[in-house]
Amino acid sequence: AVCGLGHAHPKIARALSDQGQTLLHTSNLYDIPHQTRLAERLCTLSGMDNAFFCNSGAEANEAAIKLARLKGNRAGNHTPSVVVVDGSFHGRTMATLTASGSRKVQAGFEPLLGGFVRAPFNDIDAIQAIADNNPGVVAMLVEPILGEGGIHIPDSSYLTALREICDRHQWLLMLDEVQTGNARTGRYFAYQHSDCLPDVVTTAKGLGNGVPIGVCLARGEAAELFVPGNHGSTFGGNPLACAAAHAVLDVIEEDGICAHAETQGRRIVETLRTALAGNNAVKEVRGMGARARR
């Protein structure tokens, strides 16, 4: 999920070396051209309007949760909650481990934070029931494909149905693409396999190919929630991390990585299904692009 383009990729290594000889870090009080251009590229790829840069997927998801709480509080809802799903993983900060649907991740860190409502993954009826009975909900945070939960791919209509529920109830639909983004599933983002356009998208891991970087992307109302002083990051979007991310995006585009991941992923799944057919120890082979599990 991190070094999707391999180790010591020559283009990325060269970009890091070149940037390292000029400017590694500067205050974000100044205009950082690399950062501005990267924000523009990511917004174009995702259909979002704004980008908040940080250093990891957990930080990006933390920013998304803060956006949701800001939305609620500014509307007079001082106990806003976010819908999350069983089996999910969103990080190891207090907010993101609470949002995660894994007791293993949460164990020993009680008391967990409030403000989250849980539902089964890939269960639209459960989400609708929450919408009907929980007026304090302001957003839903979900992975398009459950990662740590076992590479579970939802029904093809799942994200579209979530989008409809969120629209009806004025929730933000926030997608955690930390593991599925950056061409890993055969599209730049996994939600692009559907007609769904979220309000918030988080990405990290493969965007830096080993260099720490995370991004919380937002559009529409969600893009206007943060104002100066609401949130920040000392190192987020620094010139070195942005140089790495630009090189990653260049390679993904120039080498046709999305199409390659889709083709190779299909081949891997088909090969595994054939090789493991009749093996009683194997229940199912699941995968999309360069993500597979048996």
Task: List where the protein language model places each region.
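Conserved N-terminal phosphate-binding loop of PLP-dependent enzymes in the Aspartate aminotransferase
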Residues: 1-294
